[in-house]
């Protein structure tokens, strides 16, 4: 509970009312700047070599910087086990495989790779994804122009590759090397005719994240362990948009280079107390550029921030295991601004008896890298977000404060959990929120305050498991110059969100059903009486209305069988949006040349089937 996506994408995850860029996503300790394929509809992380995924919404360990909304820590296997494992398979979007190969007693290689089949096989799944991605994009809009376009052709593909090399020099000295690349590429040909002469030009967009890291783990004795890590994460978004109708071309790029050093030490004082401490250095370089040839226009910006962080925390577990506490302090120093940011954090849990447990979490956080959303100056109408760096003036450092208290009940395979939270995030910019009303072109600095309750219920039976999550929250903006300084609902203010799910297992067959519901996101309506002779729309009270509520039902089934004594296989089928419900994800308005107003909507995926087959060795 408390985690959803208002637009059905993995590249726009909203945690307790935050935007996606406020989530710190780590792959083996390396920050990732891209989390989705197919512009957010497919996860960019191959699940078959992910050993553990930890999600923290509050009370985060002080070893994590950034991520004022959450931390999503994806970890690959980090220990040698001398077992060979491999697998390969396909579905209606991609093919892929993985291998975990022991080279010797002291060495192991892990490899995984996926590639889409969308550029040479057209499937029903791809058809639905295509409609969803290109809806209201420049490509669809070009087809609605003056009729000069006679043909167009898009070619899209994605791939990801990850490699991890494990080498144990001795029992107490371990080296780990990581490499991963995530890539999306789109080419779009547009042909027009003028005086019987055909002209074809190509637009393209490429989005990629490449990361590499080296880690050294040292066990000094049974109590002291240290880790040193070097990493580099680069992100590139390049687009060329050739507009035949209006006779211009636009070249855009957004580039990030993130280099870091991490030192961490863990000291076991005794069986109940551990001390963690460390140092981190980060250098982030963000570049944005844009060039138009008709009329000639060029813009370029480049910012670099270097930060240093020291941290320390104590982790305590009582002898009877009833009380757990983690208390720490992180101090960030931003070299460019000469400023310190002090971030205390705490997580305390206490068992009242065998069934009930109380929990208190609190944290301070800050981050210097965020995303801005420019709906008029986007990448081909598809990717509207670009990474930017704080300049401590127009783009301040984002700071958050959060606290929550929860109670949990666990008995007879029944889990009941309730958590009340309060979160205040300051330093956001209006350009990062994606306004599509009277504030679309405004640039102001403000905050949002979200408060609510997350509830989770899970019951397990012999062959059946069911759970329900419910979140109630209110989320309001406050900007000094917007809405006369009065608070108004956040663009992702989802008051109610419910998820129901059930999994049934019988022998080698597994079937799952899920239902997702949430109330509609805020909407600003145009005024009935518009001013004449203007080039803008007159709007009513900001975010005072709501789009229709969202409801989706999914179903999936998997059958597992043996092919040989050492080989097994799985066959699966899934249907997203089983009842083909038409959900509105977004609604906004544009002004036509004749001063009339048109309403545009973004629709959810329709009924989307998928079939998979995998072999495991």
Set out the residue ranges of the language-model regions.
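Short acidic/polar hinge/loop motifs at secondary-structure boundaries
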Residues: 30-56
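Extracytoplasmic beta-strand/coil segments of soluble accessory domains associated
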Residues: 1-31
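Transmembrane beta-barrel wall of Gram-negative outer-membrane proteins
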Residues: 93-117, 135-186, 208-225, 273
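N-terminal periplasmic accessory domains that precede
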Residues: 11-14, 40-43, 58-86, 388
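Gram-negative outer-membrane beta-barrel transporters
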Residues: 320, 422-424, 443-527
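Outer membrane beta-barrel strand-and-loop segments of large Gram-negative receptors
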Residues: 258-262, 301-305, 309-311, 392-396, ...
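C-terminal beta-signal and adjacent terminal beta-strands/loops
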Residues: 118-120, 124, 130, 517-533, ...
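Surface-exposed extracellular loop regions of Gram-negative outer-membrane beta-barrel proteins
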Residues: 236-237, 290, 335, 355-403, ...
């Amino acid at each position: 509970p408390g985690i959803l996506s208002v637009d059905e994408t993995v590249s726009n995850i909203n945690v307790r009312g935050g935007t996606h860029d406020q989530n710190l996503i780590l792959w083996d300790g390396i920050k990732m700047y891209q989390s989705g394929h197919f512009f957010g509809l497919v996860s960019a992380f191959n699940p078959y070599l992910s050993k553990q995924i930890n999600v923290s919404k509050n009370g985060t360990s002080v070893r994590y910087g950034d991520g004022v909304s959450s931390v999503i820590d994806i970890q690959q296997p980090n220990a040698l086990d001398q077992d060979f494992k491999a697998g390969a398979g396909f579905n209606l979007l991609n093919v892929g495989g993985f291998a975990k190969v022991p080279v010797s007693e002291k060495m192991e290689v892990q490899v995984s790779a996926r590639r889409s089949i969308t550029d040479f096989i057209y499937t029903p799944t791809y058809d639905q994804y295509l409609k969803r991605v290109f809806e209201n994009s420049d490509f669809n809009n070009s087809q609605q122009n003056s009729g000069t376009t006679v043909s167009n052709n898009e070619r899209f593909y994605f791939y990801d590759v990850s490699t991890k090399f494990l080498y144990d020099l001795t029992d107490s000295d371990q080296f780990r090397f990581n490499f991963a690349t995530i890539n999306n590429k789109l080419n779009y040909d547009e042909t027009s005719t003028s005086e019987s002469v055909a002209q074809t030009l190509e637009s393209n967009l490429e989005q990629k994240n490449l990361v590499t890291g080296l880690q050294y783990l040292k066990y000094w004795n049974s109590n002291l362990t240290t880790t040193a890590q070097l990493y580099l994460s680069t992100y590139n978004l390049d687009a060329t948009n050739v507009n035949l109708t209006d006779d211009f071309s636009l070249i855009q790029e957004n580039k990030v280079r993130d280099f870091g050093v991490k030192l961490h030490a863990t000291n076991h004082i005794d069986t109940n107390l551990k001390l963690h401490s460390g140092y981190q250095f980060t250098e982030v370089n963000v570049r944005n550029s844009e060039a138009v040839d008709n009329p000639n226009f060029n813009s370029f910006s480049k910012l670099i921030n270097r930060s240093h962080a020291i941290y320390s925390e104590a982790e305590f577990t009582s002898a009877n295991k009833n009380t757990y506490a983690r208390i720490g302090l992180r101090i960030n120093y931003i070299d460019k601004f000469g400023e310190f940011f002090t971030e205390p954090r705490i997580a305390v849990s206490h068992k009242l008896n065998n069934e009930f447990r109380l929990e208190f979490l609190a944290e301070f956080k800050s981050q210097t890298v965020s995303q801005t959303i420019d709906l008029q100056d986007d990448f081909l109408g598809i990717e509207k977000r670009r990474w930017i760096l704080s300049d401590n003036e127009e783009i301040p450092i984002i700071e958050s404060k959060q606290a929550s208290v929860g109670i949990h009940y666990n008995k007879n395979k029944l889990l009941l959990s309730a958590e009340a939270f309060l979160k205040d995030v300051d330093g956001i910019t209006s350009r990062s929120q994606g306004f599509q009303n009277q504030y679309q072109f405004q640039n102001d600095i403000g905050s949002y305050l979200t408060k609510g309750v997350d509830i989770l219920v899970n019951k397990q039976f012999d062959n059946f498991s069911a759970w329900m999550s419910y979140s109630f929250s209110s989320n309001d903006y406050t900007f000094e110059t917007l809405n006369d300084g009065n608070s108004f609902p956040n663009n992702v203010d989802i008051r109610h969100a419910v998820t129901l799910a059930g999994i049934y297992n019988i022998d080698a067959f597994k079937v799952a059903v899920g239902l997702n519901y949430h109330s509609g996101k805020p909407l600003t309506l145009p005024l009935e009486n518009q001013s004449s002779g203007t080039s803008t729309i007159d709007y009513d009270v900001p975010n005072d209305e709501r789009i229709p509520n969202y409801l989706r039902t999914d179903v999936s089934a998997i059958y597992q069988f043996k092919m040989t004594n050492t080989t097994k296989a799985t066959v699966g089928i899934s249907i997203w949006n089983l009842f083909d419900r038409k959900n509105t994800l977004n609604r906004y308005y544009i002004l036509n040349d004749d001063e009339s107003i048109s309403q545009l909507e973004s629709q959810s995926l329709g009924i989307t089937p998928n079939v998979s087959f995998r072999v495991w060795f």
